[in-house]
Regions:
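Short, non-transmembrane alpha-helical segments in secretory-pathway proteins
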Residues: 52-94, 150-153
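Bacterial N-terminal signal peptides
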Residues: 7-17
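Primarily membrane-embedded glycan-assembly and transfer machineries that use lipid-linked glycans
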Residues: 184-191, 195-235, 246, 250-412, ...
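Exposed beta-strand-loop-beta-strand "reactive/processing" segments of non-cytosolic proteins
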Residues: 78-121
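Extended, hydrophilic extramembrane loops/domains of integral membrane proteins
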Residues: 108-144, 319-322, 327
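Membrane-embedded, hydrophobic transmembrane alpha-helices
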Residues: 10, 20-21, 137-239, 246
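Transmembrane helices and adjacent periplasmic/lumenal helix-loop junctions
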Residues: 423-447, 467, 560-568
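Membrane-interface transmembrane helices that cradle and orient dolichyl/undecaprenyl
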Residues: 166-175, 372-373, 401, 408-420
Length: 587
């Protein structure tokens, strides 16, 4: 009887275990686990005491050894790890709530080289990130994270690109440099296509040729002039009507994506709120660290909101204070109007600021066009801005990247005034530091370095700079505030790592991935030299030379950047358009 009772008890234990188990895991699991036992997870075809008693309520079904081996066997991971020495360091942790394993892989100086998720139920690798994708979520190919899903769709992007090309091409001279210039501008779209697929080692190099070409082309125009003036192939009213339609379309797309604000626009709202509360933005961004959590969990199940020093529950953006003061002051009117809840929500103030400065660029280009070429040029410039897909890309991301070009375009409109030029360069430079490189060029326009003009330019630059930097006076100590400002802005920008240009790929220490740090250093020195040369050559400059050389300096800055983004294309676009469309002898 005892034997029958034991057998019955054993059956009651084994049958539910076998019946509740999932199908067998993939056959690619390694043959042995750390204990030397068979490692195939318990399934319907598996009948053993080990399978019956291995699952613990709330515990994992798979062993760490099995999970790591499955992850390393993933083709994408295996291909990347082939670039490193064998036997990397690994770790796998199990999350009871999600029933998933997080696997991490390290290799020597390269640090963490792979990251992923493995489902405990069936051993499936649900996420696998390698190289740049480990530290940078924006490198993982999430279409629509920037610019929105509609704009990034091929059936919107390609027609918009075609409208830009057809609208500005000179049909009388199709086979010309002018046509090539327009095609090169649009070629950034090829790089973006790979970026949206998470292929950073293809997308980043593909952005270099158009930047380099446009740099050489605009520098040539600035130093040597242009052979002919391109002619518009369409009636002015047609371009104006299309421009108005596209302008309305981009605003509509922006408003239809209420949560399409990336961290850049969010930072502007936070900074403006801090200023209105009597604090400088620097060193006062919302952080996570060990502060008490508050708010709801995000898509990954993590709670990112924290109770900050001001007692509010705010969404973290710890590195949001890396921009110049003007990048935050520009958001003050919208924050005063719409306020801020403390959360990374719809952020209407960010939408309003992005749309507002986009409209200021368009209006500024119209004014510049009317001054230097009449209504046809005004319409062509406005059309070029609204039809170019990457300007919509920036405004739909609700960034601060239209602020700098808006200020510079209006400064260009008043270029005959040294006070206006000095003010514009200062305000633009304290938004994005790239604009400070334009100071020598704009100082010496139009007839070289002249004492009276230089004094007026310098005085305006100084007054505007002091007015913007006055936000540092909101801190208890001006010295400490200035030190924090330099550390959080220039200090961070000069030391940051990034995979979004080829120059910093040496950080991965991967076989076949070049270390181009020396090339970047040469480029940076060359750009600084260019910023000085254009101040002296040519000695006499007209509007065409000023526009083209401004574009060349900004392009050089972007070409040498460690962290480059498609959002930066609007910085130089107005001056590229002016260089291509302004009359040769504009006055």
């Amino acid at each position: 009887m005892r034997r029958w009772a034991c057998a019955l008890a054993l059956a009651l234990v084994l049958v539910p275990s076998a019946g509740a188990a999932d199908p067998p895991a993939p056959s690619s699991f390694p043959p042995e686990n750390v204990h030397g036992d068979a490692t195939r997870p318990c399934g319907r075809s598996t009948f053993s005491l080990a399978c019956a008693f291995s699952p613990v309520v709330g515990g994992p079904r798979l062993t760490e050894h099995v999970v790591v081996a499955r992850f390393l066997d993933e083709p994408e991971v295996a291909r990347w790890l082939d670039r490193y020495p064998r036997r990397p360091s690994t770790d796998a942790t199990f999350d009871k709530a999600t029933r998933r394993w997080t696997v991490r892989v390290w290799s020597g100086k390269a640090g963490e080289v792979a990251l992923g998720k493995v489902e405990d139920g069936d051993g499936r690798v649900s996420e696998a990130w390698t190289g740049p994708q480990v530290a940078w979520k924006m490198a993982r190919g999430r279409v629509g994270s920037f610019g929105g899903t509609v704009l990034n769709a091929w059936w919107v992007w390609i027609p918009l690109s075609a409208v830009f090309l057809v609208g500005l091409v000179d049909r009388r001279r199709l086979w010309s440099l002018h046509t090539l210039d327009l095609l090169v501008l649009l070629s950034f779209g090829l790089s973006l296509w790979f970026f949206n697929r998470g292929e950073i080692f293809r997308s980043a190099p593909l952005a270099v040729p158009p930047l380099a070409y446009l740099l050489v082309r605009t520098a040539w125009i600035g130093f040597r002039g242009r052979a002919v003036n391109p002619a518009l192939s369409w009636p002015v009213w047609v371009l104006a009507a299309v421009a108005m339609f596209l302008g309305g379309l981009r605003i509509g797309l922006n408003l239809e994506s209420p949560r399409g604000v990336i961290d850049v626009g969010y930072a502007g709202v936070i900074g403006a709120d801090r200023i209105l509360d009597g604090q400088a933005p620097y060193g006062h961004m919302p952080v996570e660290d060990s502060r008490p959590a508050c708010g709801k969990a995000d898509a990954d199940g993590a709670i990112r909101d924290r109770i900050q020093q001001n007692g509010r529950c705010e969404s973290a953006n710890p590195r949001g204070d890396t921009y110049g003061p003007m990048a935050y002051l520009a958001y003050v009117p919208a924050v005063l109007t719409f306020g801020w809840s403390g959360k990374w929500d719809a952020l209407p103030a960010a939408h309003a600021t992005a749309i507002g400065f986009d409209l200021l660029v368009i209006l500024g280009l119209i004014m510049v066009g009317r001054r230097f070429g009449g209504t046809p040029l005004a319409v062509a410039l406005a059309f070029g801005w609204v039809a170019f897909p990457f300007t919509a890309y920036a405004v739909n991301s609700n960034t601060n990247d239209a602020i700098m070009p808006a200020i510079l375009v209006w400064g260009f409109w008043l270029a005959t005034s040294p006070v206006a030029r000095g003010t514009a360069v200062a305000l633009a430079g304290w938004t994005k530091f790239a604009a400070l490189l334009l100071a020598p060029l704009w100082l010496t326009y139009p007839n070289g370095l002249q004492r009276r003009t230089a004094v007026r330019f310098a005085a305006a630059f100084t007054v505007a700079s002091l007015a913007v930097l006055a936000v540092l006076l909101l801190e208890p100590s001006l010295v400490a505030g200035a030190r924090t400002f330099l550390d959080r802005t220039l200090g961070f920008q000069l030391e940051r790592d990034s995979p979004f240009s080829p120059w910093d790929w040496g950080q991965y220490h991967a076989r076949g991935i070049p270390d181009l740090a020396a090339v970047q250093l040469i480029l940076q020195v060359a750009v600084l030299a260019l910023a000085g040369v254009v101040a002296a050559i040519p000695r006499r400059k007209g509007p065409l030379e000023l526009a083209a050389l401004s574009a060349a300096v900004l392009l050089g800055f972007e070409l040498a950047l460690t962290h480059w983004s498609y959002l930066y294309i609007p910085w130089f676009l107005p001056f590229v358009l002016l260089g291509l469309l302004l009359p040769r002898r504009a006055t």
